[in-house]
């Protein structure tokens, strides 16, 4: 059970924003290949694998079972990079705004991944124009890294 739990944690830590699940799919294919299970990827990016059937002591075949799971995660899309390295992001999925403050995130870019932290502006310091905008602030150590 510990290995199953760790495998699940490892999969959940792989970035897989909706529409960008290739890293998760590659990890699943690699894990299955390591135990000799052939896989294929369909045109939508789904990983498909088949396991040999089993029979009981009386020779009765077990029923076929399909396991289906999402590979994607909730996340953000970068809408603007400010001169000081601040990223303005828009939520992708049903993330509750109140739950995001001070959360550690991974910003995935063409040249690699960078750690970031979601920050929010105090309500009394937010201008009326900013209150209606559906993005959150995210900052990285320097704008050079962005």
Residue ranges and their predicted role:
Residues 1-138, 142-144:
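N-terminal hydrophobic/helix-forming segments and targeting peptides
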């Amino acid at each position: 059970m510990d290995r199953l739990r760790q495998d699940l944690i490892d999969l959940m830590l792989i970035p897989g924003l909706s529409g960008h699940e290739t890293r998760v799919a590659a990890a699943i294919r690699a894990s299955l290949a390591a135990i000799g299970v052939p896989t294929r990827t369909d045109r939508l990016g789904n990983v498909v694998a088949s396991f040999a059937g089993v029979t009981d002591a009386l020779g009765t075949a077990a029923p076929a079972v399909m396991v289906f799971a999402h590979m994607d995660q909730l996340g953000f899309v970068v809408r603007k990079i400010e001169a000081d390295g601040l990223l303005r992001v828009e939520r992708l999925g049903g993330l509750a705004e109140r739950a995001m403050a001070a959360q550690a995130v991974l910003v995935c870019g063409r040249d690699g991944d960078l750690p970031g932290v979601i920050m929010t502006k105090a309500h009394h310091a937010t201008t009326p124009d900013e209150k209606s905008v559906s993005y959150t602030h995210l900052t990285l150590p320097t704008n050079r890294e962005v």
